[in-house]
Swiss-Prot record:
The keyword Lipid biosynthesis does not apply. This is Arginine--tRNA ligase. It holds the Pfam family Arg_tRNA_synt_N. It catalyses: tRNA(Arg) + L-arginine + ATP = L-arginyl-tRNA(Arg) + AMP + diphosphate. GO terms for molecular function: arginine-tRNA ligase activity; ATP binding. PANTHER family: ARGININE--TRNA LIGASE, CYTOPLASMIC, ARGINYL-TRNA SYNTHETASE. It comes from Methylorubrum extorquens (strain PA1) (Methylobacterium extorquens). The gene is argS. InterPro entries: aa-tRNA-synth_I_CS, Arg-tRNA-ligase, Arg-tRNA-synth_N, Arg-tRNA-synth_N_sf, ArgRS_core, DALR_anticod-bd, Rossmann-like_a/b/a_fold, tRNAsynth_Ia_anticodon-bd. PROSITE patterns: AA_TRNA_LIGASE_I.
Length: 585
């Protein structure tokens, strides 16, 4: 039950009534009419902008139109007050029965409460895509958690979602990986090695070298580089991806598709060559020279005639090169081919989750997706800012020794999956995140993950208290739904909890539409806080205790309320990929 959608429909019906009575002209554009929470909760339960956005088209004063609409809305018994504020906003105060119906809906729908049928076709979300050259670091973890939570969020809102990882296994960096692993292979066979500048010095490649020695013995030593390099490269990539998958599994990250970059460039150029042919057929490829970029020239800029894509026709700043001077494809050409492949597989919305250093990538790829799909697909690029590791407010040294750094696995082992996931999502993705290893394990209100999980655990602790105080009573959701008298819930704290529960479907919907899972984390903290506050009031005022053995009616009503609120906490935590414990240990 989404009260915002429900009363948006009611507002539209009231506007139609005004049209039928001649007080509004026909054919008004209602697409911008919304119902949302008022900016100040003291003004009411809902607010609509209808009078403001329609006044100009209707050629009416917005306040006068607002008064006419408010008068029409007051005829609805579910609306106890409709008042015009400011330039023409209409604030609505709802009858208690509306919120009682929300609680009943939450109890009857269980984990499906708030989940929607968001319009739109299949979504492809690509996230993590860390180079298979070493362990994941904390920055990778932020993108992984954000992408996974966004996938959960869109799925909860009703969109079909494909979760994808792009394996960068075709660039020069995997040859560097292979040569580094080959040195560790020689080391495993007893040689003393020196790792030259430009190769990967980390100890994480020692086990790869040992497994190479176990698999191949000394045979690779007798082969020239052009023979052993492809074998070691494939072996090392597989080993790195196995390590990355283990790290992802440790924080509950999953993917449906692992797509290899190398598969794009098959025989005769493969899918990248197909892309160039498709762009040529559209008249979007030409031979020309690019003007020098402003400021310091990048190393890869060349003053020569090049094969260019007309990306500036689709919103990019300049046209882009598709072929290098040696005739090989540019990274950009491969990226376009990959995104075209995602679209051809059926996704009409593509989302890339990338590090903040990819800001320059956004316009060109959005232009490319628009071009290859003839405007049928759109690309949203979500950039994740840096993570600063702290311990009790002091920066943590990221490098432990030469070639070694603090890995995502180190952080998982220290603070656990739930703390990482919740805190990575408790700040907007494009803002730098301070992750304090000491604070995220505190058992206090200042630690959001503890505070929200404690709110969910409280759902079960009050249920245990009720069973002890009133043995033989049935406190299942179905029983509470059948006979709890919700009209006794009149305390401001109870009303606040009901209002927050009623907001959950809209929070889920708006967070999904904006691609912003942090909204769920903020909402969960506020909702858990409302339960903790009411619980604390009951310690001082016996009549407000959730479980009162001498008052069966209030006990059952409050348990119904807590059960509904706890269900919302569990649902929201599931979207974030965080556990909802029945008790805190």
């Amino acid at each position: 039950m989404n009260i915002f959608a429900l009363f948006e429909t009611r507002v539209r019906e009231a506007l139609e009534s005004l049209t039928r009575s001649g007080r509004l002209p026909e054919g008004l554009d209602l697409s911008r009419v919304v119902v949302e929470p008022p900016r100040d909760a003291s003004h009411g339960d809902l607010a609509t902008n209808a009078a403001l956005v329609l006044a100009k088209e209707a050629k009416q004063n917005p306040k006068a139109l607002g008064e006419a609409l408010a008068e029409e809305l007051r005829t609805d018994p579910r609306i106890v007050e409709a008042s015009v504020a400011g330039p023409g906003f209409i604030n609505l105060r709802l009858a208690p029965e509306v919120f009682q119906d929300v609680i009943r809906a939450a109890l009857s729908e269980g984990e499906n409460f708030g989940r929607g049928q968001m319009p739109g076709g299949p979504v492809n979300i690509e996230y993590v895509s860390a180079n298979p050259t070493g362990p994941m670091h904390v920055g990778h973890g932020r993108g992984a958690v954000f992408g996974d939570a966004l996938a959960n969020l869109l799925a909860a809102a009703g969109r079909p979602v494909t979760r994808e990882y792009y394996i960068n296994d075709a660039g020069a960096q995997v040859d560097v990986l292979a040569r580094s692993a080959y040195l560790r292979y020689r080391e495993a066979l007893g040689e003393t090695i020196t790792i030259p500048e430009g190769l990967y010095p980390g100890d994480y490649l020692k086990p790869v070298g040992m497994r190479l020695a176990e698999t191949h013995g000394r045979t690779l030593l007798d082969q020239p580089e052009h023979e052993w390099l492809p074998q070691v490269r494939r072996f090392a990539i597989d080993a790195m991806m196995a390590m990355i998958r283990e790290d992802l599994a440790a924080i509950g990250i999953r993917h449906d598709v692992f797509f290899s970059e190398a598969t794009l460039q098959g025989e005769n150029g493969g899918k990248v060559a197909e892309l160039l042919d498709a762009l040529r057929q559209k008249g979007l490829v030409y031979e020309g020279r690019l003007p020098p970029p402003k400021g310091q020239l990048p190393d890869d800029w060349e003053d020569r005639e090049q094969t260019l894509f007309r990306s500036s026709q689709f919103g990019d700043d300049v046209d882009r090169a598709l072929l290098k001077s040696d005739g090989s494809f540019t990274y950009f050409a491969s990226d376009i081919a990959y995104h075209r492949d995602k679209w051809l597989r059926g996704a009409n919305e593509l989302i890339d989750v990338l590090g903040a250093d990819h800001g320059g990538y956004v316009k060109r790829m959005q232009a490319a997706v628009k071009a290859v799909s003839d405007g049928q697909a759109r690309l949203d690029v979500k950039l994740c800012q840096l993570v600063r590791l702290l311990r009790a407010g002091e920066p943590v040294k990221m490098s432990k020794r030469a070639g070694e750094f603090v890995t995502l696995r180190d952080v998982i082992d220290e603070v656990g999956r739930d703390a990482i996931r919740f805190m990575m999502l408790y700040r907007k993705n494009d803002a730098t995140l301070d992750f304090d290893l000491a604070k995220v394990v505190e058992q206090s209100k200042d630690n959001p993950v503890f505070y929200v999980q404690y709110g969910h655990a409280r759902r079960f602790s009050v249920l245990r208290q009720a069973r002890e105080a009133l043995p033989g009573e049935d406190f299942s959701p179905a029983a509470l739904l059948a006979d709890a008298d919700l009209s006794v819930l009149t305390d401001p704290g109870e009303i606040e909890m009901m209002r927050l529960i009623a907001q959950y479907p809209r929070v889920l919907e708006s967070a999904a539409a904006a691609h912003e899972p942090h909204r769920i984390a903020f909402y969960l903290y506020e909702t858990a806080s409302s339960l903790h506050s009411f619980w604390n009031k009951g310690k001082d005022l016996p009549q407000l205790r959730i479980v009162n053995p001498t008052d069966r009616n209030s006990t059952r009503a409050r348990l119904a309320l807590v059960e509904a609120l706890g269900g919302v906490l569990a649902s929201g935590l599931a979207v974030l990929g965080v556990s909802a414990p029945n008790e805190m240990r």
